[in-house]
């Protein structure tokens, strides 16, 4: 009798971890609307759980529960609803949230918008599976963004410096070279370490500390090929994770692409200790996908047809930037969005500006005059610039030089407008100085080559070259002590 009890106990011990309740397969599709499928008679559906969908032809798709009403569930299908019917389609509710495999080996790889490899390489050997919505971060554990990320672009580094952990968007428009700017920043971006100027080094090549996560949403094949080829040819692919959602991919996939990218960035930053720059392009495509889902759910539309919760939804993406106390890494976000009809009051840039910490403005007039990158510094702003620059981080004179460039450029713009009314003959000699500065600033400082990487010190020295056009008396934003040290005006 005792041996029978032992045998029974052994059988239970061996089998108890392997016995599970089988998942129910549902064939109760009640309707299809755009990217959404309505499933009836579901036993205890859960909000945000993943649904495995098998079509009549044997292909598999994934979806996520968007809405629950009793035993009725609304599922958004990531790969699109084409081919789904109410006879042959079966659905399994997994009870799990959408997670993505993450690993340090993802660096140098190319994935589609759902996180599946498309570069011909093997699947990712996951070190962890993380919820794509991200982990909750205790606000009191966040640290203030400090220290600068060097982009190699003078107008950004000198006048709109980006701090590690900051979120700052690039406001562009159709036909402007925002993709070129994004690729150039990926090539050139690196860290600037603390210390004095003599001991400070450009850490752009310290790839073990710096990484880039690039997510493209709704791009065409030509643009996707451009990014892949550019990263591979310039060696930046080794430190980059690339996610590509193409224009012919399902629109609904754009909802999860930035979240998968940010989940990967969080792992690299907080678990691997890397300083990660996340570039998301184009957030307008993401917002349009959000509007499509909202329309399919027949929700009450907000401004221009976008859902009323778009502000909250965008915040769930942008607010995942930052630094955490006790963790070495950081996440800096540079989302790119195209303003419809060049309208900065459009809901997408308008709401983005409320959430983020500044903006970098790409200007069509500068682009039409063959100036690259066509970044207009006057409407541009970096709210955290003051914490990223100065002695020990960049250079002591950085803030004063930036302020003086802004002041002189603004005055130069006013003088140019006045010249159009009264003519050049009516201008004073001082006005002519500002006009000369305006032209040289745009042609020498703003304008730079696609493959011209300027260090922050190169850019500051170039700024001083332009400021020396003026006598010391006109450089009112710079202290006498700094002028005495840095101002060496040529007498020739």
From Swiss-Prot:
GO terms for cellular component: proton-transporting V-type ATPase, V1 domain. The keyword Ion transport applies. It holds the Pfam family ATP-synt_VA_C. Keywords: Hydrogen ion transport, Ion transport, Transport. InterPro entries: ATP-synt_VA_C, ATPase_a/bsu_AS, ATPase_F1/V1/A1_a/bsu_N, ATPase_F1/V1/A1_a/bsu_nucl-bd, ATPase_V1-cplx_bsu, P-loop_NTPase, V-ATPase_su_B/beta. CDD domains: ATP-synt_V_A-type_beta_C, ATP-synt_V_A-type_beta_N, V_A-ATPase_B. PROSITE patterns: ATPASE_ALPHA_BETA (PS00152). GO terms for biological process: ATP metabolic process; vacuolar acidification. GO terms for molecular function: ATP binding; proton-transporting ATPase activity, rotational mechanism. Non-catalytic subunit of the peripheral V1 complex of vacuolar ATPase. V-ATPase is responsible for acidifying a variety of intracellular compartments in eukaryotic cells. V-ATPase is a heteromultimeric enzyme composed of a peripheral catalytic V1 complex (main components: subunits A, B, C, D, E, and F) attached to an integral membrane V0 proton pore complex (main component: the proteolipid protein). Belongs to the ATPase alpha/beta chains family. This is V-type proton ATPase subunit B 1.
